[in-house]
C-alpha cells in the first residue's frame, strides 16, 4: 500500500489493497510488481476495472533473481585428521529488495524504473541479523576452533536480486560441504566419518548415522562406475536437519545419470 501510494503520488488512505490468497512463493516473486502495474494503468484509465496478469514467461523474465554467490574457503588439518583452522568468505548481492515501508518502497517496484520520472534502484545495506541474507549458514555446524567468517556485499551487479528461499544458505552450505568432501578425499578418510569426527550436535550425528545405514544397506546394489556424494546441514543451525546422498553415473560424453537419492530429515 505504501509503495503504490508513494509511486503514484497518492495519499495512503486513497489506496486500498485487498489481499487474495494464491499460490505460495519461496521468496520475492513478481506479485507486488504486477499489482502496481494494474494500479498504474487504472490511474490513467479511469472508470475501468483493470485485470492484469503476468504470464509465466513474464515472471521468469522480470521477477527478482536470487543473487549469485562466490565462496572462498581455506582450511588446515593436523596429523589426526582434525580441522584446526577454517576460513570462509562469501561475496554476493542483496537478498532483500521487497517493498518495505520506511525504506523507499516505491523504488522497489519494477515499473517505477521505466516511468518518465524514474526512481533510482535502492541500495540496501548489509543485513546484520544472525544467519541473515548473504551470511545465512556461513557459520559451519561442525566443531572448528575459531572459524574466520567474512561476508562481502557486492554492489552494482546487472540483475535485480531479492529473496530466494534459504537466501545465502544455498551457496554457503554447498561450499562448506564441498570443502568437507575435498578434505576427506585428500586425507583418504571416509566422508561420513570425517563429518562425524567434527560434529558435537547429537541430532545431527544421528541424522548422518541413519543416512550411512541406508547407504550401506543398499551398497551391494550400486552399479559399477557409479559415484556417491553426501552432504549434511542444519538450516540456520537452529532449524531442521538434512542429510543427503546422491548416487549417479557420468559417461564418457559427460551425460549424468541419476540413479538414486537417499535423504534423512529431522524436523522434530
Predicted regions and their residues:
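Structural alpha/beta core scaffold segments of enzyme domains
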Residues: 1-268
Amino acid at each position: 500500500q505504501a509503495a503504490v501510494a508513494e509511486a503514484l503520488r497518492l495519499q495512503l488512505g486513497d489506496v486500498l489493497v485487498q489481499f487474495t490468497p494464491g499460490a505460495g512463493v519461496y521468496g520475492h516473486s513478481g506479485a507486488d510488481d504486477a499489482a502496481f502495474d494494474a494500479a498504474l494503468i487504472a490511474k490513467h484509465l479511469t472508470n475501468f476495472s483493470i485485470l492484469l496478469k503476468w504470464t509465466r514467461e513474464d515472471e521468469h523474465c522480470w521477477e527478482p533473481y536470487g543473487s549469485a554467490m562466490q565462496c572462498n574457503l581455506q582450511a588446515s588439518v593436523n596429523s589426526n585428521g582434525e580441522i584446526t583452522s577454517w576460513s570462509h568468505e562469501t561475496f554476493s548481492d542483496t537478498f532483500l529488495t521487497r517493498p518495505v515501508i520506511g525504506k523507499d518502497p516505491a523504488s522497489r517496484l519494477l515499473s517505477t524504473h521505466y516511468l518518465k520520472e524514474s526512481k533510482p534502484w535502492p541500495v540496501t545495506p548489509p543485513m546484520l541479523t544472525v544467519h541473515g541474507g548473504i551470511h545465512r549458514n556461513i557459520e559451519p555446524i561442525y566443531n572448528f576452533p575459531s572459524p574466520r567468517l567474512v561476508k562481502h556485499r557486492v554492489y552494482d551487479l546487472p540483475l535485480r536480486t531479492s529473496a530466494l528461499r534459504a537466501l545465502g544458505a544455498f551457496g554457503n552450505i554447498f561450499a562448506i560441504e564441498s570443502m568437507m568432501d575435498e578434505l576427506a578425499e585428500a586425507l583418504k578418510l571416509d566422508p561420513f566419518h570425517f563429518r562425524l569426527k567434527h560434529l558435537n550436535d547429537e541430532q545431527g550425528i544421528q541424522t548422518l548415522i541413519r543416512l550411512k545405514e541406508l547407504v550401506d544397506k543398499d551398497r551391494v546394489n550400486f552399479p559399477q562406475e557409479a559415484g556417491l556424494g553426501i552432504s549434511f546441514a542444519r538450516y540456520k543451525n537452529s532449524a531442521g536437519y538434512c542429510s543427503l546422498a546422491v548416487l549417479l553415473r557420468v559417461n564418457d560424453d559427460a551425460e549424468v545419470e541419476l540413479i538414486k537419492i537417499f535423504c534423512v530429515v529431522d524436523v522434530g
